[in-house]
Amino acid sequence: MEQMRPEHPLGMLCRVLGVSVSGFHASRSRGPSRRAQEEPRLEIEIRAAHQRTRQTYGPERLQRDLIAHGVRVGVHRIKRLRRKLGLRCKQRRKFKATTDSRHSLPVAENLLDQRFEAEAPSQSWLSDITYVPTDEGWLYVVGHKDLCTRKIVGYAMGKRMTKHLVMESLLRAVEVTRPPAGLLHHSDKGSQYCSHEYRRMLEGLGMKASMSGTGNCFDNAPMESFWATLKTELIFHRHFATRQQAIREITEYIEVFYNRQRLQKQLDYLSPAAFERRYYEQRLAA
């Protein structure tokens, strides 16, 4: 209304906009509303949260992060201020799978059968392999993910995609979690997982092997989802001069951000570590 006053009579503007002249003058004397006065501070808080969460959170998860830092604000307001500030999440891209199931090794039955829920930690693990480009060539990354906590419990990286790399990731997961016998281990039908050495290792640890159907990425969807998240939030936005640089940054992403800080909707907006901690606290209290 202030912008149109030089060109139009005040009385006419008030009639068109449905306000009284006295009401207009009263609003001017009151000054900016408390809500309007909050905007600059909220913009700073939202921008800080966007950076703190590595530009990966949408409005709902951003709201949870802000609440955790003592800032209460509605989702719709966050959406509006994000648009105003030009803040956007990192975007996903498509990437190719690494599985080569063209071999004559024995294959396990699909025991998991897309039942992506687990009642307790160390009940079901998922595993898969992906690759990361560096100036030195490909870096292959193996991961093991707990289906209950969504935590990456084991991982290993190297310049070759071998059964030994997969075995190293499994050993790390076992050393960290000490799972009970009977754990369900699900993977694709890649030759690394079907190798005699790896199958023997699973048997020695008392784990039951389960494998996806041929060419069906949905059979291992939570693990595929982690790779997509890693690539969207880190890999696609970085240039790695060496494999060692990539190893350092991927390790930091998994250990510091993904496992301990990154909120997940399916975990009641907790991080994997916080969800796991809550599980054991509730179990002790029961």
Label for each model-derived stretch:
Residues 1-286:
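Charged DNA-binding/catalytic regions of mobile-element recombinases
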